[in-house]
C-alpha cells in the first residue's frame, strides 16, 4: 500500500543565522523562503533567488556528473550529506541506480581505505578504548535525543578488505544512508558508531594521517568488556533502539550476536541480513523454475559466519517447506579453505559443527583425496545452487562451473563476495561457461551481460532489499527483539516481489526504483510477525500500516517557525 500524502506540520526551530546554515538536518540552503530568511536572520547570507528542492537537486546532479572517478563522486555526495541532508536524500532518490554503488558498495570500500585522507567533517560517534570510562558522557554528547537505529562497527572486517581501523566508519554511515533512502527512516533517528579498539593494519599504524588510536587491537576479555560497556551505555541512553552490528570479524560476530540479540533489539546484517536476502532470492529463483528450495542441493564456498548464517536460514526455510531437519542439512555442503566440512575435520568453529557432512556417507565419492575440494564436491554432489562467500577472487573456475552445468541445465550461481575485486567469478564468465543458462546473482553491482547477442540482466543480491524494511518494521511496530521468524517473513515478502516470479522474465530481484515499495511491504510483514511472536504489541493491520506511513520520512523541506531554546 502506498503512503497517503498529507501536509507536513511546521517545525519550530531555535537556531538562526549561520548556525542554522551549519545544521545539516535543518539547512535548506537557497530554498529558505523570504519569510524564513527574515525570521531566522538569514537575509544577505544566501543568494537572492529562492529555489525549490528539485532545482537544487538538478544543480547538484550537474555538479556530480562533472566528477570523473567514483571516489570523487562519493566525496562530493558525502559533502552534501554533511551540509544539507534533505537535499542529499532527494538527489540520491532521484538517481538511486547511479548513486547507490557510490554511497555504498563497492565505492565505500575505497572510502574506508582512504578515510583519514579524505576526512572532511565529523559524522557519528567515535568511541576509543582510551575513552572507555567516559562512555555515558560520549553518548550524552549526541545532539539527537530520539535515536532509533544505530549501526556500529569495530572496523576489523570491512567488506573483503580486512582491518581498516576507524576507516570502517564509512560502513555505518553508508548503511544508515540506505536505511533512509530505501526504508524511509528519518536521518534524525540514525547514528553511526565506530568502536576504536586499535588496529593491526601496519599500514595504518605507520600512516601519519591516520586518525584512530595507534595501538594493536585489544582482544579477549578486554575487548568483550569494552563492547559490553558500550551496549549497557546504549541501553541506558536509548533503551528502545535498534542496534545493527556491522563488519565485525568472524571470531567476534557470532558471539556478540548470540550474547546480545535477546538483551537489546539487535541483529547482524552480515550474518542475518545477507542470509535473508539470499534466501529470498533463492525462494524466488526456485519458484520461477517451477519448484521449491527444498528440492535443491546447495554448495557453499566460504564457511565463515556469513556463509553459515545463510546456510542455517536455508535449512530453516526448507524445513518450512516440509523437510525434516536431518534431510534439510543433508542438502547443504560447506567448503572452506581446508575443503568440505566433515565430522572428521579438527578445529571447527562452534557455528560450523551443525553444518558438517558425515564422512562415512561420502565413501562412494569419486575422489582419491583426503581433502575434498570445491571441484570434488561439485563433481559428486551435482548441486543446483553454488554460493560464494569466500572473499577470494576467481575461485569459481571455468572447470568448476562447467562441471556444475553438466548435471544442472539451469544452475543458480551466486558469487556474493564484496567488493567487486573479491568476487569468486564475474557474471560474464559464468554466463559464457554455462552457454547462457545460469541464473546469476552477485553481491556487488554488475552491468548486464551481453552474450551471443542476448542481454542477461544481473541481479544484485543486495542487503538493502532487506535491512531498511526490517528497520522500518521494527520502528513502526515497536518490536523489542528481532526473531528468526521476522527475518524469514522478510525473505518471503522479498520473493513475492521478484519480477521473474511475477512476470516469468526479468530480474530475480526487484529493480531499485521499487525498493521503497518493497521496503514498506517487508516492514509490514516484519511488524506483523513481531506481533505474532509476542515481541510487539498487537494491533490491527490498519493500525500497523498507519504506523509505517507515519514513520516513513520523505526528502521534502518543511516550513519553519521561530522559537526560543
Swiss-Prot record:
Its cofactor is Mg(2+); Mn(2+). The keyword ATP-binding does not apply. A divalent metal cation binds at residues 246-247, 270. GO terms for cellular component: cytosol. Gene3D superfamilies: Malic enzyme, N-terminal domain (3.40.50.10380), NAD(P)-binding Rossmann-like Domain (3.40.50.720). It is an enzyme of class 1 (oxidoreductase). Keywords: Metal-binding, NAD, Oxidoreductase. Pfam families: malic, Malic_M. PROSITE patterns: MALIC_ENZYMES. It catalyses: (S)-malate + NAD(+) = pyruvate + CO2 + NADH; oxaloacetate + H(+) = pyruvate + CO2. Coiled coil: none annotated. HAMAP family: NAD_malic_enz. This is NAD-dependent malic enzyme.
